[in-house]
């Protein structure tokens, strides 16, 4: 869909959904892997409609992976958290923060950061972990790379976590050590930043403790 000079060939995923001239363009990066392909995010009124490649001769030229184009759908996914809850009930932001502060003060805290976070977010995540005297973990994602547009490291910013000092070594794909600490009652509160812990090796039963 990027090779048609007159726009006669278009993506079926985007076709007829929104007039292009209504959309706001924001420069971004592909979050599929650590390649960091340059992209443009097209949105209107807070809704993301598509992602297209942005030229960078040193990284991705004028291309991006097909799978990377579809990642925008995760933003509006039905199973994504869309409201603030405490113990399964709707809550205000202030109440949720107060509850979190109480739990952090009780100690035995672990912080799970994300390799999808920006450097600034990882810096703040480290500050939070340090303030809470918490252990720090990061979830690794590994997949097949093509050597061009997709790397085997499927996290876009593990390097940022290393640079900020949030972690000191490359992460594992499963949070085995954290799961063991939960079972041994060494960890009573987990702060997860943008990660689904059930995918990273913790069971629903462990998280309910």
Indicate residue ranges for each PLM-predicted region.
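Catalytic alpha/large subunits of respiratory electron-transfer oxidoreductases
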Residues: 1, 10-209
């Amino acid at each position: 869909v990027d090779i048609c000079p007159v726009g006669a060939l278009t993506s079926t995923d985007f076709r007829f959904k929104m007039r292009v001239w209504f959309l706001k363009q924001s420069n971004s990066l592909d979050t599929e892997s650590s390649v960091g392909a340059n992209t443009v995010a097209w949105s209107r009124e807070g809704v993301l409609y598509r992602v297209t490649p942005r030229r960078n001769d040193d990284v991705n030229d004028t291309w991006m992976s097909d799978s990377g184009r579809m990642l925008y759908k995760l933003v509006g996914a039905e199973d994504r958290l869309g409201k603030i809850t405490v113990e399964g009930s709707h809550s205000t932001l202030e109440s949720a923060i107060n509850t979190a502060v109480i739990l952090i003060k009780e100690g035995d805290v672990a912080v799970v950061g994300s390799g999808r976070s920006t450097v600034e977010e990882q810096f703040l995540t480290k500050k939070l972990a340090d303030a809470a005297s918490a252990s720090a973990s990061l979830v690794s994602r590994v997949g097949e790379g093509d050597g061009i547009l997709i790397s085997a490291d499927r996290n876009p910013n593990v390097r940022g976590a290393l640079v900020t000092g949030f972690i000191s070594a490359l992460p594992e794909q499963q949070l085995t050590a954290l799961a063991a600490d939960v079972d041994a009652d060494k960890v009573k509160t987990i702060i997860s930043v943008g990660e689904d812990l059930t995918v990273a090796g913790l069971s629903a039963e462990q998280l309910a403790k």
